[in-house]
From Swiss-Prot:
Pfam families: Oxidored_q2 (PF00420). NDH-1 shuttles electrons from NADH, via FMN and iron-sulfur (Fe-S) centers, to quinones in the respiratory chain. The immediate electron acceptor for the enzyme in this species is believed to be ubiquinone. Couples the redox reaction to proton translocation (for every two electrons transferred, four hydrogen ions are translocated across the cytoplasmic membrane), and thus conserves the redox energy in a proton gradient. This is NADH-quinone oxidoreductase subunit K. HAMAP family: NDH1_NuoK. It comes from Coxiella burnetii (strain RSA 493 / Nine Mile phase I). The lineage of its organism: Bacteria, Pseudomonadati, Pseudomonadota, Gammaproteobacteria, Legionellales. It catalyses: a quinone + NADH + 5 H(+)(in) = a quinol + NAD(+) + 4 H(+)(out). The keyword Phosphoprotein does not apply. One of its GO terms (biological process) is ATP synthesis coupled electron transport.
Length: 101
């Protein structure tokens, strides 16, 4: 059996990569959305690792719900980005300040 620390290190690396992607790339909204999803997957990895370590299944069930909500969030976010691209011709963050709401 793989020790818990290895899974936590993998989760921390994935979370760090997602966070670094957000910090480095602040222009493209699709890349920002992908980095946020990577961070969510890192958190899910930690939930699964702790669930296996403690012998409880609550963490795995929680991950299932997180993945469901994340899929819905991604679908809605991509739909908004497609509409924004059709209207403005760009998906840069700098162009988002012209949105009315």
């Amino acid at each position: 059996m793989i020790p818990l620390g290895y899974f936590l290190i993998i989760g921390a690396i994935l979370f760090g990569l997602g966070f670094a992607g957000i910090i480095i790339n602040r222009k493209n909204l699709i890349v920002l959305l992908m980095c946020i999803e990577l961070m969510l997957l890192a958190v899910n990895t930690n939930f699964i690792a702790f669930s296996q370590y403690l012998g409880a299944r609550a963490g795995e069930i929680f991950v299932f719900f997180i993945l469901t909500v994340a899929a819905a969030e991604s679908a809605i976010g991509l739909a908004i980005l497609v509409l924004f691209y059709r209207r403005r011709g760009s998906i840069n963050v700098d162009d988002m300040n012209i949105l009315k709401g």
